[in-house]
UniProtKB/Swiss-Prot annotation:
<comment type="subunit">
    <text>Interacts with atgl-1.</text>
</comment>
<keyword id="KW-0442">Lipid degradation</keyword>
<feature type="domain" description="AB hydrolase-1">
    <location>
        <begin position="73"/>
        <end position="203"/>
    </location>
</feature>
<dbReference type="GO" id="GO:0055088">
    <property type="term" value="P:lipid homeostasis"/>
</dbReference>
<comment type="function">
    <text>Acts coordinately with atgl-1 within the lipolytic cascade to distribute stored energy to tissues during nutritional deprivation.</text>
</comment>
<dbReference type="GO" id="GO:0005811">
    <property type="term" value="C:lipid droplet"/>
</dbReference>
<comment type="similarity">
    <text>Belongs to the peptidase S33 family. ABHD4/ABHD5 subfamily.</text>
</comment>
<keyword id="KW-0443">Lipid metabolism</keyword>
<keyword id="KW-0551">Lipid droplet</keyword>
<dbReference type="GO" id="GO:0016042">
    <property type="term" value="P:lipid catabolic process"/>
</dbReference>
<dbReference type="GO" id="GO:0005739">
    <property type="term" value="C:mitochondrion"/>
</dbReference>
<dbReference type="GO" id="GO:0006654">
    <property type="term" value="P:phosphatidic acid biosynthetic process"/>
</dbReference>
<dbReference type="Pfam" id="PF00561">
    <property type="entry name" value="Abhydrolase_1"/>
</dbReference>
<dbReference type="GO" id="GO:0052689">
    <property type="term" value="F:carboxylic ester hydrolase activity"/>
</dbReference>
<dbReference type="InterPro" id="IPR029058">
    <property type="entry name" value="AB_hydrolase_fold"/>
</dbReference>
<dbReference type="InterPro" id="IPR000073">
    <property type="entry name" value="AB_hydrolase_1"/>
</dbReference>
<dbReference type="GO" id="GO:0042171">
    <property type="term" value="F:lysophosphatidic acid acyltransferase activity"/>
</dbReference>
Length: 360
């Protein structure tokens, strides 16, 4: 009896973890509602890339005014487990004279779940190759790349290999920059749930526990993270929770690649701080952190002090957590506009909104 019960439970969990056509349709619906809640008009398509004949899910918001003619565009890259709809509060503001694009990186979200190399360095280069194929297919000459968390790591890796295609890097609470240090040496203590997630990542794919919860996941995550509803309002209370659940339900090939890039508790095996100064000095970079984020801005400060004859800007948005772009979209969008419109020599000194460190 016990064996039969166990087999039934395992079968139920395996069924929960299957991404069906209905799951795909539900993901499309809740994503659409998140865009609709912010009144964002967008185009969605799948962009083919060479790597294992994959397709990169992409959304585009056209400029409100005359589009620039130099082939530049703004590109948002979401963090681990996130998707294009996380930036709905930013698209309209940023799409003034530039087309704004966002994509789910290959292996994540609504993109193909292609398998990457088990070698972390090779997997990183494969992801960079996919980004470059995507850029070519989109017909973009240069990109203002806005990467959040793991998206910031990917943006930096791309800039190392393709600096001539980067107009500016905007790295939002980027993951993977710091070298591993002892817990007692950390300047900022991470939230308990972040420490838990980092610990789990050492043994399982990061979002495996959520997949095991099956259809109960949205309700459980809502109990654990009620703040997400405030940051990412949809037309219905469960939209953001269903979105994150369905995004991470398919075969987790991207998560597996990420896990291969990490040490226990989420440190990067190849921290970007050791490599960042290899990026061409003509590529400007703006770091944006939330004052309440658990990510340490120390690596950005180190880069600022050592990256001579290059533009490095550090902004800390007061009252914001790691999702700076959602916690204070007005301040975030203003920073992005300053970068895109070339107001780099005059960073804001309005400390009621943000604290700024700047080197030029």
């Amino acid at each position: 009896m016990a064996i039969a019960t166990t087999k039934t439970a395992l079968t139920t969990i395996m069924n929960w973890m299957t991404f069906t056509d209905d799951s795909k349709e539900q993901l499309k619906i809740v994503e659409g509602r998140l865009f609709q809640s912010c009144e964002v008009s967008y185009e969605a398509k799948y962009v083919p890339v060479r790597f294992k004949r994959g397709e990169v899910y992409t959304v585009t918001v056209r400029p409100r005014e005359a589009e620039n003619l130099n082939g530049e565009a703004i590109v948002f890259i979401p963090g681990l487990g996130a998707g294009v709809a996380m930036f709905t509060a930013n698209f309209n503001s940023c799409a003034k004279n530039h087309a704004v694009h966002s994509f789910d990186p290959l292996g994540f979200g609504r993109s193909s779940r292609s398998r990457f190399s088990d070698d972390n360095a090779i997997a990183e280069l494969e992801m960079v190759e996919v980004m470059e194929d995507w850029r070519k297919a989109m017909g973009i000459e240069k990109m203002y790349i806005i990467g959040h968390a793991f998206g910031g790591y990917l943006a930096s890796a791309y800039a190392l290999e393709n600096p001539s295609r980067v107009a500016h890097l905007i790295l939002v609470d980027p993951w993977g920059f710091a070298e591993k240090v002892e817990t007692t040496e950390k300047l900022i203590k991470p939230y308990a749930w972040m420490s838990f997630l980092g610990g789990v990542a050492g043994y399982f794919n990061p979002f495996s526990p959520m997949r095991w919860m099956g259809p109960y996941a949205p309700a459980i995550v809502k109990k654990l993270r009620p703040d997400l509803l405030l940051r990412f309002p949809g037309l219905h209370d469960y939209d953001i929770y269903k979105y994150v659940y369905y995004l991470n339900l398919p075969n987790p090939t991207g998560e597996t690649a990420f896990m291969n890039m990490t040490l226990p508790v989420g440190w990067a095996k190849r921290p970007m701080i050791k490599r960042f100064n290899g990026i061409d000095k003509n590529v400007g970079v703006s770091f944006i952190y939330g004052s309440k984020s658990w990510i340490d801005p120390g690596p950005a400060i180190d880069i600022q002090s050592t990256r001579e004859n290059a533009y490095v800007d550090i902004k800390i948005v007061r009252g914001a957590g790691t999702h700076v772009y959602a916690d204070d979209p007005a301040a975030f969008n203003e920073i992005v506009s300053d970068v895109v419109e070339g107001r780099l020599s005059n960073p804001s000194n309005d400390f009621e909104i943000e604290e700024c460190c700047h080197s030029d």
